[in-house]
Each structure stands twice: as C-alpha cells, then as structure tokens.
C-alpha cells in the first residue's frame, strides 16, 4: 500500500487510540448483521439469530479482536502486506473457503466503525488513508485466490 508520510502518521496516530477488543467485536458483528450471508463461515459461533444475539456473542467479540490484532500487524508492515498476510490468505482460501469479497466488506465496515467511534477526529483525510489500508489488506488476504 502506498501511503504518504502524512497518511501513515494519520493512520498510526488514530490506531494507537483504538480499543481492539471493542472495535473488533463491533466490526465483525456489524459485518454479520449487515451482510447475513457471511454468517455461514461462523456457524460454530452459536447464536447468530438476531442483531442483538450477534453483537452480544462472546465468540464474535473474541474473533473480532483476533482480526484486529492481525490488522495491527499489517499496519506495522504496510510495505509487505502480502507477506504479512500470506498464511492467513492460505488458511482462508484453502481451508475455510471464504469468499475474498468478504475481506473488502469487513474493511469497509471497519472504516464505518472507526468513523462512529472517533467522530470529528475521523476526518475525510483520515478516512481516505484508512480506505487505502483496508483495500491493501483485503487484496493481501485475497492473494492466494489468484
């Protein structure tokens, strides 16, 4: 992902304030609510029968945290996203058979959640930088599919 120095600073400064536990669970939960077909990959998570059940599901929250911890690793390695996410790409492609479009959807949901949490601090410039990052991460995760 090519970010200017200003964009990298904006992304890392905001990310330092992110509560990974809270934002991760909310982002994954919203993905499952807004795009219900993605739930098929999480059948082992138990009750996903309603938005309240999804948002309160401890397995959704735990996996959301795990996802954002991986995203944090990506932010430390913006110049090598494909390498950083190679094993996860292989897992999601070969073993889990996740539709790579879901990575793009989750990235966009994450941007919405960040905007909600940070309000005015999430300026259009910060959003533009995050859109680049989530697109880069989604492409890296989809790499094994090509």
From Swiss-Prot:
Modified residues (N6-acetyllysine): 59, 82, 144
Entry-annotated residues carrying Phosphoserine: 44
Keyword tags: Acetylation, Heme, Iron, Metal-binding, Oxygen transport, Phosphoprotein, S-nitrosylation, Transport
Distribution of this protein across tissues and organs: Red blood cells.
Sites of N-acetylvaline modification: 1
Limits of the Globin domain: 2-146
Molecular function (Gene Ontology), one example: oxygen carrier activity
Its biological purpose: Involved in oxygen transport from the lung to the various peripheral tissues.
Name by which UniProt lists this protein: Hemoglobin subunit beta
Organism per entry: Nasua nasua (Ring-tailed coati)
Encoding gene (name): HBB
